Structures are given as C-alpha cells and as structure tokens.
Curated annotation (Swiss-Prot):
Organism name: Arthrobacter globiformis
Co-factor remark: Binds 1 Mg(2+) ion per subunit.
Biased composition (Low complexity): 511-531
Record-level GO BP terms: L-tryptophan biosynthetic process
Assigned protein family: Belongs to the anthranilate synthase component I family.
One Gene Ontology molecular-function label: metal ion binding
Protein name (Swiss-Prot/TrEMBL): Anthranilate synthase component 1
Coiled coil residues, start to end: none
Reported function: Part of a heterotetrameric complex that catalyzes the two-step biosynthesis of anthranilate, an intermediate in the biosynthesis of L-tryptophan. In the first step, the glutamine-binding beta subunit (TrpG) of anthranilate synthase (AS) provides the glutamine amidotransferase activity which generates ammonia as a substrate that, along with chorismate, is used in the second step, catalyzed by the large alpha subunit of AS (TrpE) to produce anthranilate. In the absence of TrpG, TrpE can synthesize anthranilate directly from chorismate and high concentrations of ammonia.
Amino acid sequence: MQDLGIISPGLEEFRELAAHSRVIPVRLKVLADAETPIGLYRKLAQGQPGTFLMESAAVGGAWSRYSFIGSRSRATLTTKDGQAHWLGEPPAGVPVDGNPVDAIRDTIEALRTDRFDGLPPFTSGLVGFLGWETVRHWEKLTRPPEDDLQLPELALNLVTDMAVHDNMDGTVLLIANAINFDNSSERVDEAWHDAVARVKELLARISTPVLQPVSVLEPAALDFAASVQERWNEPEYLAALDRGKEAIVDGEVFQVVISRRFEMECGASPLDVYRVLRNTNPSPYMYIFSLEDAAGRQYSIVGSSPEALVTVTGEDVITHPIAGSRPRGKTVDADKALAEELLADQKERAEHLMLVDLSRNDLSKVCVAGSVDVTQFMEVERFSHIMHLVSTVVGRLAPTAKAYDVLKATFPAGTLSGAPKPRALRLLDELEPHRRGIYGGVVGYLDFAGDMDMAIAIRSALLREGRAYVQAGGGIVADSSNPAEAQETVNKAAAPLRAVHTAGSLHNITPDSVSAPDSVSSPDSVTEANS
C-alpha cells in the first residue's frame, strides 16, 4: 500500500527508461474497493471501438486476481483484403501492409520493452483476437470456404490507456502507456507530461459517479430454441460427419473437428450479453472486445472460454489440452458418477491422449530439447455447467524463440482442428461450407515484455448489426455417433446463445418500478406472484 497515490515513474526515471524503451507504462495505484470490473468498464470504455474487458474465473467459480479494462487504443492492427491494415495511428517502423502475421511479429519487436517488476502480468502490448483464417498465413491452404461474414482475419489493439482491477487488495492501477510513436529521442519530457495528464483523466473518470443500473429478467417474448437458426442444417452437417469418417477410415486423419454456426437476433447491448454470460457461465477466460473493421463497421466479441491455447511467461511455456466432457451432475453423487464415467470412457481417453501428444509435438518446435513434459495428465476439472478432461504440457522456451514463435507453432489448437493437424486443416476446408471467423482462433494478448496469454475462441459470440453468431464443433473419430456429435455442437453453443437470448430480457428497475402483491393469502399465491 506504500505506493498508493504516487505516479510512477517520475520524470528522471522516465528519461532513463526512454533511452532504451519505446513503451513505458506511466501508472497510478488507488484504493478503489467499491469498484467492480463491470463498473470500471462502464466508466472507462462504454463499448467504444478499441476498448475491452478481460477477466478470469478460476475452477470452482472464484474470480482470479486481475481484471483488465482497456479504455483507449491509439491504433489497431487488422486486415483488409487479406493484408495488414492499421486503424488509427501506427507507430513508426512497423509494417503498414503485407502479411498480417509478419506485422504482428515486427510490431512486437519494434516496441519491445523492459519487464517491470511488481506490476500485473499485462500492462502494454497488442490485445484482441486472431481468427481461424490467420492460419492461412502459416499453412499452405489453397481452398478456403466462402467468406460470408466478411470479418477481418484479426484485430489487435495497441493498448494506450487501461485500468487493472486487483480483486485481492481492492486497488485499481491506472495506466497510460507513453508510446514513442515516431521513434525519436526528442520530446521525452513532453511524452511523460502527456501520460501523466492521461492518468489524471482516468482518475477523474473513475471518480465520477455513473449510473449503474440494477436489472431483473422479464419473461422472454420468444422461445429460446425457436429463436436460434442453424447456418448449416442438420442433414447436411451429418453428411459432412460421414465424409469425415471416411477420411479417418482411409487413414488420412485420426480425428477431425467439424463445426457449424448458429445465429439469432440480438437486440441487447454487448455489455448486457457479457453480464449474463459472466453470471451464468464463469470461465478461466472471460472477455468483451469492441472493435471495428476497415470499413468502419463496428462489432463485438463476447466470450467465456475454458481453454487456453498457450501462455508464455518469461521462459515458461504452458498449454492445457482439453478433450472429453460431461455435463455437471445435479447432485454431488451424480456429479461424481459422471466424472467416473468420463474417466472410464475409452473413446474420450484415446482422443485426449492424441491431443496431448499433439501439444507435446507443438511445444517441442520452440522449447529447449528435453524440457517438454506433461505435469498433469487427464484429470477432471469442473466448470459451472460442464466438466472436462484436462492435461498440462510445459516446456522451457528456446533461446532463439519468442512468444510469436510459440503462437505460430501451436496455432490453431489441435482440439479445434484434429490430427494430424496439416491434413485436418485441409479437410476442414473441404467439408465446412463457410469460413470460421473468430471460432477456433484465439483471444488474448502479446505484451511488449515478451509474454503472451491466448485463449481458444470457443463459447464465444460475434455480435454485429443486430445479429449474434456462435459456432461449435465436435471431434469425430471412426466410431463416433453422428447424432451424438451433432448434439454436442448444440450443447457447446448453448451458453453464449442463451446469454444473448437472456440479455434481451434484462430490464433495469428503480424503487418506483418495483411492485408487490397487495396481500398474501397462501404459499401458493407467493409462488404465483413470483413466477
């Protein structure tokens, strides 16, 4: 608590840092134990393009220590016609066109900064999403499906101003990144004063009261199931599963993950969808990103992903392959029985082992020889509505590799493609009728100190122009049941779709709008009045 209320670094230290770093987080920590991440998002972001909220609920539902609220991004790296494209003002020396994944690598290198001890794991960097189609810049895939959504392949915000809510000690760290945009040694003092002014502006904004509505649910006007549309109808989807099985029998792949998209109208705000999803399906990766494409069309990504693709912290590289699932039981005994059933399912175990081997192979490309190890194998982890078989594969980053190289080696997750990955990717282009968009890509950040935390974009909704799009898939093997696999896609898509549906029924209330029955004559009437 000794550092509360002190802007850091001071001008002299800032001058020293600026001599060898193009990005310096100027920050102020305040005690704000009455604030919540949602409240801070309302005050600082308000759903404007380039803003975000990232949170994490640990296994068991407890919220993790940090929540990250992005208030302003001076530039966003995205794509236009398959080429790198910047919105806003890109820093000097970074690619402004060409291969977008090269632009990610070169931007990280150009703005690489020191690691600041004692700060949260993320203070500056690129944050957003890389969609499934990004893989086409790393793999030779020549037959892409129809691009019906016309979504950018990626969108990564260059974080300028942000707040970090510390759930453990009740503080908020306000950060204004001083970014040397013109790569010049001039105007260093001016950059510090500008960052200090922005920190003070953030403080003023979180100190200003903002209406925080209290909400209740009204009965939904439309039935949930009736409001969902399948972009790929079930008979056609089942036929694709058959073709996937033929490829497995022919020895082309061991497994392939065939997905389909669901759609529905969305009249709710992205924040309300996130609020519902946060309440009903807390997961290790919770996020809302507000973005725009090169044509100025705004869209949002709201998600609740249980699965990391990969994290890099210093030299430590970690991935958590997840494969195999059961719903949570309604009682403790039922939950235990389902977990035992999952552990005993030979098909689930075989698929999981295959994906653990794939993760080991991916990490071996970028880690020190002999350092890749499985530290957790096929253990049941329970989430709010589902349980999974989870393993942990770790390695030590090779001296010649960086976080970008780890991303390239592991993207996309084998749990979303199948194995062997190269052939599975080509097979998916043949079987799926539309490009996947955000589904199966990643969301998260690459920071300028060299770390990375990327979640797989599943259990996520794309919200754009009054529509919600949710995609889900299931890994099939030779003896898979097609109807069961089809139902699995429905089950996996249910959480974000229900969040969209429920958010449309949220209604803000005031004391004057609350009504109560005039009299209560029996227990039955209480039930009726509250039903």
